[in-house]
Structure formats: structure tokens, C-alpha cells
């Protein structure tokens, strides 16, 4: 039930982002009396989405300064991923370790054949093998569910909306009131849209990210057959991230943070609509309910 609801919610949220983008395009066309800008943004959006999607693994791994690892360097990580990928009938992803004590993990890649899973040094030291299995099951399901495509589209459209809103603000100020022709519309409406559209795009993008996390929690726990292992891991990761947070001033890390299993930055100042991840307490409660209901089918154990 949750899975179908979350899938529909993701589609509706992506649709909402395109509605915002079209509204900006309509406003720019009215303010400048030139509809060519709509086509320009559409082409740029498609190219940006394609580049981000095709190179998602390289961009994310590079941003975390991660290095590839062998079975000898990370035997537990390698063995768990090998077992789970075999149980899921999927190819083995490439494995990386990021040199930071902040406990976290993420998966990236445009499809299972070009996937990568990265753990930080901190998470490998913090979790026991059962908890690590829960985390890796979660990350593998992001790849199998094609979440990278969803997040790439959302990020690209959000970026285009921000750029388009800046252009709309300029057009509304300098181009909205020329002559006696009122076809350009009210410049105040354009200014209001220019200010609110990027905020709306960000809220929608973050809502999509939170929705995909819930799905990966559920599907990953079904793959491992152990929802409580992931619940225990999330509890430890939240505490570890508070003790060893990542740098919020590092833009590359910020751009990758939505891929991570938990918020890598300290504190809970950002709440509600502006969370990159669902509240850890909510995720743990769902996993505990899943365990009580007997959810999960043990795999590769």
C-alpha cells in the first residue's frame, strides 16, 4: 500500500515541478513577448537531466573523494553486497569508501549495470555486520528502483526553475511595462512568481527525496529480511552524524547529501518541508511496524 502511494506521490510531485516551470515560461513569454525562451529552457532542461543522469556515479563519487575498494580491503562490505545482489538477481555494483569519519552511505548510477555503492569509513567502524547489511540493502534498492533517474530529473528541473525565475525577475522589472500593450501581464505577478517558484521547486524536490527514502527502507528490509537491523543502524547513524557531521559549506557534499541514507549535517534546525530526509524517528517507527507485521523475506542469509 505504502509503495503504490509513494509511487503516485512521486509522479504527482514531478508533475508539479513541470507545472511550476511552465508557469515561469508562460510569464517570461508574456513579459518579453517572445515564446522562444520556453523552448530554450526545455532543451537546456533535457540536456542537463541527461548529463546528470549519465554521469551521476562519477559526480557523486568524486564529490566524496571516495576510492574503490577490493574484497581484501572491505571483506564484510563486499560479501554482503555480493550476497544481496545475487539474491535480487542483479549485477554486483562497484564498491567505494569515502575517507570521512561521518557515518553515512549512498548508492548511485544510472542503472544496475553501472551502479556504485559507497560507505564512509565512519559507518564501517560504527555499525555491526547485521546493521551494515540493513544499510546496504537500502542502498541497493535505490539503484534497483531507478531512484537515480527520479532524483536527476528533479534536480535538473529545480535548477532550471531557479535560472528561469531569475530571468523572469529581470523581465518583469525591465520588460513588463513597455508601451501601452498589456499583453505582457502584470509585472508584479511576474516578480511574485520569480520569488516563489524556486522555493516551490526546492520543497517539491525535497519531498521527492523523502518519498524515495521510505520506499528504499521498505524494499531494502524485504531484501534483507531484517527491518530492525536498518532501524538500529539509522539510530546509530543519526547519533554519529551529530558527533562527526559533514561540512555544510562544502557545496559538493551538499549536492550529494540527498543521496545519503541519513542527513549528514549536524542538528535538527531544518524541519518539515525543508528536510532532505524523513525524520529518523518516523523511519524507525515504520520499520518497527514492518517487523511486527512480519515484513521482509530473508535473502542471502
Swiss-Prot record:
Q: One matching Pfam family, short form?
A: Peptidase_M48
Paste the cofactor note.
Binds 1 zinc ion per subunit.
Question: Which GO terms of type biological process are on file?
Answer: proteolysis
Record's keyword annotation contains Membrane: yes
Enzyme class label:
hydrolase
InterPro entries in the cross-refs: HtpX_protease, Pept_M48_protease_HtpX, Peptidase_M48
Subcellular location per UniProt equals: Cell membrane
Q: Which UniProt keywords apply?
A: Cell membrane, Hydrolase, Membrane, Metal-binding, Metalloprotease, Protease, Transmembrane, Transmembrane helix, Zinc
Transmembrane parts of this sequence: 11-31, 34-54, 154-174, 188-208
Assigned GO CC terms: plasma membrane
Q: Which PROSITE patterns match?
A: ZINC_PROTEASE
| Superkingdom, natural source | Bacteria
Q: Which interval of the chain is the signal sequence?
A: none
Please give the chief subcellular localization of this protein. Answer: membrane
Q: Does the keyword Membrane apply?
A: yes
The residues responsible for catalysis, as annotated, are 139
Query: Per UniProt, where does Zn(2+) bind?
Result: 138, 142, 213
Please name the GO terms that the record assigns under molecular function.
metalloendopeptidase activity; zinc ion binding
Named cofactor requirement(s): Zn(2+)
UniProt family annotation? Belongs to the peptidase M48B family.
**Cross-referenced HAMAP family:** Pept_M48_protease_HtpX (MF_00188)
**What name does UniProt use for this protein?**
Protease HtpX homolog
Tell me what gene encodes this: htpX
